[in-house]
């Protein structure tokens, strides 16, 4: 279990993202007291570079994204990443996605990605962020038609949504260009 030991945790809100990536990397759950304390913090004064460093570690070293990103959801930090938050409210057709909604599907995909990393940091960064962003268009395109859940055009719609998300994390134009078509 990951747990803050003093209230100094609040002096640098980046520690919330650090807990996210440590949780995903090491397989530790975050203690409920730390989750509650994290809810009181904001990332508004954290530079993009520092934010990106923690997301980069998550993508390159995370093994259990359900733990890491699940912590982000539990401490309500998905409010800073509405593109991800919306995935949790978007159902999918259970015939094609028995694992559940788009959020759950994305976490499963990230866990699968973690098992096949290539060893090339750049390639893993591109693929990892592509996996994270691959269904961001579904919340804006999902419809129920003839009792089936469909998301026509979600890939195309997701490009600008993913671009906005990535631009808030990093100014690495080459990375964004390679992640997005």
Protein language model annotation of sequence segments:
Residues 1-132, 136-153, 157-174:
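Glycine- and charge-enriched loop/helix tracts that form the active or gating conduit
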Residues 176-181:
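Phosphate-backbone recognition surface of nucleic-acid-processing proteins
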């Amino acid at each position: 279990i990951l747990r803050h030991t003093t209230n100094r945790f609040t002096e640098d809100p980046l520690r919330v993202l650090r807990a996210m990536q440590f949780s995903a990397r090491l397989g530790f759950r975050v203690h409920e007291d730390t989750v509650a304390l994290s809810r009181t913090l904001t990332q508004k004064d954290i530079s993009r570079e520092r934010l990106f460093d923690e997301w980069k570690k998550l993508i390159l070293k995370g093994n259990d994204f359900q733990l890491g990103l699940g912590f982000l959801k539990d401490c309500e930090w998905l409010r800073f990443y509405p593109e991800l938050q919306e995935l949790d409210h978007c159902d999918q057709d259970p015939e094609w996605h028995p694992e559940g909604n788009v959020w759950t599907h994305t976490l499963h995909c990230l866990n699968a990605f973690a098992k096949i990393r290539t060893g090339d940091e750049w390639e893993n960064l591109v693929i990892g962020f592509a996996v994270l962003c691959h269904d961001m268009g579904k919340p804006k395109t999902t419809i129920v038609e003839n009792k089936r859940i469909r998301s026509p055009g979600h890939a195309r719609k997701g490009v600008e949504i993913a671009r906005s998300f990535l631009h808030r994390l990093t100014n690495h134009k080459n990375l964004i260009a390679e992640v997005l078509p």
